UniProtKB/Swiss-Prot annotation:
Keywords: ATP synthesis, Cell inner membrane, Cell membrane, CF(1), Hydrogen ion transport, Ion transport, Membrane, Transport. It comes from the Bacteria. The gene is atpH. Gene3D superfamilies: N-terminal domain of the delta subunit of the F1F0-ATP synthase. The lineage of its organism: Bacteria, Pseudomonadati, Pseudomonadota, Gammaproteobacteria, Oceanospirillales. F-type ATPases have 2 components, F(1) - the catalytic core - and F(0) - the membrane proton channel. F(1) has five subunits: alpha(3), beta(3), gamma(1), delta(1), epsilon(1). F(0) has three main subunits: a(1), b(2) and c(10-14). The alpha and beta chains form an alternating ring which encloses part of the gamma chain. F(1) is attached to F(0) by a central stalk formed by the gamma and epsilon chains, while a peripheral stalk is formed by the delta and b chains. GO terms for cellular component: plasma membrane; proton-transporting ATP synthase complex. It comes from Alcanivorax borkumensis (strain ATCC 700651 / DSM 11573 / NCIMB 13689 / SK2). It is found in: Cell inner membrane. GO terms for molecular function: proton-transporting ATP synthase activity, rotational mechanism. It is a peripheral membrane protein. InterPro entries: ATP_synth_OSCP/delta_N_sf (IPR026015), ATPase_OSCP/d_CS (IPR020781), ATPase_OSCP/dsu (IPR000711). This is ATP synthase subunit delta.
Length: 178
């Protein structure tokens, strides 16, 4: 996954810079969201993976599915991704675009996964600690994963803070095995 993120990052940055220069960040966010959904669709992937199709046909089909939501610059972006065999990276490109957008707006998108539902006081305390550590405001998305056993797993961009019991047990097992 880290390798795919590294490959996708220049595309996300190029899209972000272009959108910012043309005052179209919101429009590009919507376009990339739709394009990522289309690229992530199993039937569309199967169609685009056909080796007998040339790049122009793939781009045309992709643009037709996206409809009017994909403007000329978006179509050119999709064409470049298709030519470089990077179209499957669109969901990662969208994620990185969101991170760049949040960074520009002085926000960091944070995913907090806990073993059990957190009450408001615990969430507020964690948000305050994250604001201090990251140095920005945070947009928090919370979810529950009981397989963590206890504790919290936090993802903020490329940073992962694993304070879960499962993570501690895994680290302990690694130490015992080495």
């Amino acid at each position: 996954m880290a390798e795919l993120t590294t490959i996708a990052r220049p595309y996300a940055k190029a899209a972000f810079v272009f959108a910012k220069e043309h005052d179209a960040l919101e429009q590009w966010e919507k376009m990339l969201g739709l394009a990522a959904a289309v690229a992530g669709d199993a039937s569309m992937r199967a169609y685009l993976d056909q080796p007998e199709l040339d790049d122009a046909t793939k781009v045309s089909a992709f643009a037709e599915v996206c409809g009017d939501e994909l403007d000329e610059s978006g179509r050119n972006f999709v064409a470049q991704l298709t030519q470089n065999k990077r179209l499957p990276l669109l969901p990662i490109i969208l994620q990185l675009f969101h991170e760049l957008l949040a960074e520009q707006q002085q926000f960091t998108d944070v995913e907090m996964i806990s073993a059990f539902e957190l009450d408001d006081a615990a969430t507020d305390k964690l948000v305050a600690a994250l604001k201090k550590r990251l140095g920005t405001e945070v947009n928090v998305t919370t979810s529950v994963d009981q397989s963590l056993i206890g504790g919290v797993l936090v993802r903020a961009g490329d940073t992962v803070i694993d304070g879960s019991v499962r993570g501690r047990l895994n680290r302990l097992a690694e130490q015992l095995n080495s």
